[in-house]
């Protein structure tokens, strides 16, 4: 990151840079990477991550490219690693239209989710706030080391900004961090394997899709070839 050199963005695949597309004022808009057939990922030492202190864990997440998954409020930018947040929020119940069902797509990755939560707890001075569906708490009700809260009602009830305002309102100079549930899993997966996880679940849905479904792909993958495989009205 130009504004914070400690923050690294890593490639989701091994290969070579095919092109760099720039926009106004030479701003980088897109980096096209030609993927190689092998998965030559950098391996990090993670066997003792549970024994790391806050600063050591921050360095591990920064060096491995996992830090950009953590965002801060206000403004919704990448979290400043030099700050300690007032709280960290993870909402597993989204109410915006066509949002994926995290209880479904993360059903087989609950241990990685738990590990990700445990890591986030090291970065703040209080347990993570974990939002769950009031009518169907599902797999997330048994997550330990969190402050559970329930979400009900129509959109925008699932908007995490509303949850922050209710549970940890921001005063002048305060920062609250938020993490997407699937990115919590990616953090946990990294802490289990030592490798950056590029996996991303995409919902192919909408009125024009005859057979909506979830697709597991890689972060940054071009979506048009995937969409072309579906019958559209």
Locations of the language-model features?
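Generic structural motif
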Residues: 2-4, 9-19
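Generic structural signal for buried aliphatic residues
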Residues: 1-2, 223
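Buried, small/hydrophobic-residue-enriched core segments of structured protein domains
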Residues: 7, 21-225, 229-233
């Amino acid at each position: 990151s130009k504004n914070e050199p400690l923050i690294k963005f890593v490639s989701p695949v091994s290969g070579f840079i095919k092109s760099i597309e720039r926009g106004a004022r030479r701003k980088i808009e897109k980096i096209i990477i030609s993927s190689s057939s092998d998965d030559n990922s950098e391996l990090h030492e993670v066997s003792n991550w549970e024994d790391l202190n806050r600063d050591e864990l921050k360095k591990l997440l920064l060096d491995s490219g996992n830090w950009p998954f953590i965002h801060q409020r206000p403004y919704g930018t990448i979290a400043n690693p030099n700050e300690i947040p007032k709280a960290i929020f993870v909402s597993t119940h989204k109410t915006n239209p066509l949002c994926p069902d995290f209880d479904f797509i993360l059903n087989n990755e609950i241990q990685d989710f738990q590990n990700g939560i445990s890591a986030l707890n090291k970065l703040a001075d209080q347990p993570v706030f974990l939002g769950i569906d009031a009518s169907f708490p599902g797999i997330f009700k048994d997550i330990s080391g969190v402050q559970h809260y329930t979400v009900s009602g129509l959109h925008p009830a699932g908007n995490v900004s509303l949850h922050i305002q209710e549970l940890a309102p921001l005063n002048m100079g305060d920062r609250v961090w938020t993490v997407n549930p699937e990115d919590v899993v990616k953090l946990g997966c990294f802490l289990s394997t030592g490798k950056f996880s590029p996996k991303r679940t995409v919902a192919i849905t909408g009125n024009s899709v005859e057979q909506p479904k979830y697709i597991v792909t890689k972060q940054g993958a071009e979506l048009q070839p995937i969409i072309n495989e579906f019958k559209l009205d």
